[in-house]
Amino acid sequence: MISLITATYGRTEEVRTLLGSLARQSYKDFEFILVDQNPHFILREMVAEYASRLTIQYIRSEAKGLSLNRNIGLDYSRGEIVAFPDDDCFYEEDVLEKVIDVFQRQKDIVLVATAVKDAFDGRVWKVSERELISRNKTLRYCFSNNIFVRKTEARFDVRLGVGAYWGSGEESDYLWEI
């Protein structure tokens, strides 16, 4: 199973787009964990609309901070593989199927990074399947919305990321911990 963990604040239509892309996935053995930092449970009804099509855990969090809330999602996750789609991204229909195929064929890998296409300007950041991602390449190829990792005890440093003292760097730090 794959656990997809999204921490969100201040976005509604973007989350709807993400949910729609998840409902269209060809691979179905995944759960979506939405950690909602918004006031007044504004996403609860939207999540309910998708509950019959997706395995969703909706978690309301009073605490603010991307890394902190991703860690909350990790605490609830049941998958052997975890990923952290941003609340403003979406996946092509076969992404999860391709990712799980790589993990099943290559039992010793801990990380799969997919290609990323910028929806605004069409730029693509692509990783070759044969290319190994070393520590030095995580900054070049690994973004929060394109990394899938075998679940470990690793957690995000709550001092890093949106809403924290240091506003970025949480993905690289997390991957280096793995």
Model-derived regions, located:
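Conserved donor NDP-sugar-binding/catalytic core segment of glycosyltransferases
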Residues: D94-W125
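Conserved nucleotide-sugar donor-binding
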Residues: R78-G79, F143-V158
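Glycine-rich, basic loop-to-helix element that forms the pyrophosphate-binding segment
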Residues: S61-S77
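N-proximal low-complexity "stem/linker" segments adjacent to membrane-targeting elements
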Residues: M1-R24
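Acidic donor-binding segment of Leloir-type glycosyltransferases
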Residues: L19-R60
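Acidic donor-binding loop at a coil-to-helix junction in glycosyltransferase catalytic cores
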Residues: G163-Y174
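Cell-envelope/extracellular polymer assembly enzymes that use nucleotide-activated donors
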Residues: M1-S3, E31, D173
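Short aromatic/hydrophobic "clamp" motif used to bind/position activated sugar donors
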Residues: V82
